[in-house]
Design a protein with these regions (language model features):
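Extended substrate-binding grooves/exosites of carbohydrate-active enzymes
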Residues: 1-213
């Protein structure tokens, strides 16, 4: 299965998923974690789009654009309300649009974990980078929704240890629906060291100044 984080992909990709039998979570182009994720603090009062009326039209427009373009692809089984935009009424209204327009597919949104005011935005419990024990705590507490680990095991180089502890949950808990790896691609650029030997360089290897994040 594939999550098209964090926006719809080019149409050819869905054709290939249809042909080869991949399940798809099609994700709307909504991403605003820069408005509320600050160093050492979370500021929900800065959240966009939340329930701000001036954003509702844009939120629904992006949902419509995705659904109308992609609705005939059988590989798509879930619509996603976007990525890391906290929560709020506008995203809930987006989820309701998906259900009214297409009641054959489920709706996903990870942000309900952070903002329970509109818990019905998502048809499944979803989190990013949860620890194994945190997932088990949820699954052992009479869950009313299946758990989808929508983003996890992000790694650079050889730092990706312990993945088996997550995959083992799939056989242990019927309500655990697996997860989506971020992001199965080399995060570096091939370059050469001073001896002419090639290596994959990551951030900080180019004499660049790291950002706050």
């Amino acid at each position: 299965a594939v999550r098209t984080s964090h926006y719809p992909n080019q149409s050819l990709w869905y054709d290939l998923c249809d042909e080869y039998g991949l399940y798809v979570i099609d994700e709307a182009n909504i991403e605003s974690h820069g408005t509320w994720q600050k160093i050492g603090e979370v500021r929900p009062d800065h959240v966009v789009p939340d329930g701000k009326s001036e954003w509702l039209g844009t939120v629904i427009d992006r949902a419509k654009s995705m659904v109308e373009r992609d609705k005939n692809h059988p590989s798509i089984i879930i619509w996603s309300c976007g990525n890391e935009s906290y929560g709020g009424e506008n995203l809930y209204k987006m989820s309701e649009y998906f259900r009214e327009r297409d009641n054959t597919r489920l709706v996903h949104y990870e942000g309900i974990f952070r903002d329970r005011r509109f818990n019905d935005t998502s048809d499944m419990e979803s989190r990013m980078y949860a620890k194994v024990y945190e997932i088990e705590e949820y699954l052992n507490n009479n869950p009313d929704k299946p758990f989808v680990h929508c983003e996890y095991t992000h790694a650079m180089g050889n730092s990706n240890g312990g993945m088996h502890k997550y995959t083992e949950l799939e056989n242990k808990y019927p309500m655990y629906q697996g997860g989506f790896i971020w992001d199965y691609i080399d995060q570096g650029i091939m370059t050469k060291d001073r001896y002419g030997k090639e290596y994959l360089a990551f951030g900080g290897d180019f004499g660049d100044r790291p950002t706050d994040y």
